[in-house]
């Protein structure tokens, strides 16, 4: 539809290049910014209700009234022109569901929080700050290497519950510093960070700081610096903790600092994963200078799959490496949610009916993602002209392959438990609802924050499980005098030098992957919701 007197939608902001070599950026409420050419940017800046001929005279060569009309039609289709195609944005909300795996709560505008120190951030030497941060990062790694014995004690032995609380509280505080590292770096380059807040990202609590204004920066290296600032900041904090720990005498205080340092380093490392929208992805996107890299790579990968499976014509629009990158991006969320299900399911099942429903919803969503992926592939192939018979055959082959994998791939059915000693001997401590077989081999361990150390072995004796009060530290890596409800069985043929209580692993016979999934996830959920036993 031709717009006789085009006017830019009032909620659209057009940013001129910040410096030579930078891009024109169009900012839209609750949407990703658009990068446009200089000619389109100039046109958008002049759309004030005049007719195309008047606009063409003001803009000069190469614009004509016809070119202005054609460009306005395309901009109108994007919702940038005032009129029926440009719906007014909804009021800015504090709580935003970005996707089923990302829920955000906006707390405050980061640029306002950083305003008091903005002059300092602008004047700071970027090279000096980077050198200092890298020196702390490397110095911390050297400090950890020099404290091997204390590090093993901190990561591989039970710690007080207060130590765990301090480590995770410190990690939460460091996450806030991490995000402000992004905002501070963008501010240094004369950009303006957006919202700061907290979010649930793939079932994991986290913070965020919007730095989409970084697309206005002239150099890709500046955008990479903004993306990597959080990781470098967090790793520098980890290095500080490790070096301080080297000056602290042995004990729980030293273990707290070492545990906090390692957890921070690992958190920074996880943020480098480029297959989900973490810092590593943002840095990669900035480095290759391809906006919406992940979405476009996944589209490229789907097109490549259609070509390989059905012979549908594939026109490559991105570098060849984006195909394997896109395939990994497609499958990675399923992997992350699967790990999250394994991590949280036993905790949630301990919450009763509500926890059982949550686990069921999580497993259902995992299944939905898998089915949706196959359905999307078949639907796109059908739209490209692939016959129904070939599509049906492909679906049958894919489902048969999944069935064969679940049937013939065997996994170890180990059960995590604990042990405790008293005057009557050593007993296996089981979480409620766990079933084991008499005579099964048991590894007795000392559990810690990151890993366990084998102390000995035993076998499960005959008899019925006894419901009783057990040490909480037998089921967790916490050193505490708290007790909880659990089930116990006698252990026989005990060998090794054992702690008073600790972790245990019951070695189970290998079983098909499908049976293992049902035994460890589906049946416990069924029992929790419907209260039925085998």
Where are these regions (language model features)?
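Hydrophobic alpha-helical membrane-insertion signals
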Residues: 388, 406-534
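Core alpha-helical transmembrane segments of integral membrane proteins
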Residues: 99-198, 240-243, 247
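Internal/C-terminal transmembrane anchor helices
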Residues: 381-413
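Membrane-embedded catalytic scaffold of the fatty acid hydroxylase/desaturase
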Residues: 160-314
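Loop-to-transmembrane boundary segments
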Residues: 118-133, 213-234, 305-335, 388-395
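Long, charge-rich, low-complexity alpha-helical segments
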Residues: 30-117
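Membrane-embedded alpha-helical segments of integral membrane proteins
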Residues: 323-375
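Long, low-complexity, charged/polar intrinsically disordered regions in eukaryotic proteins
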Residues: 1-29
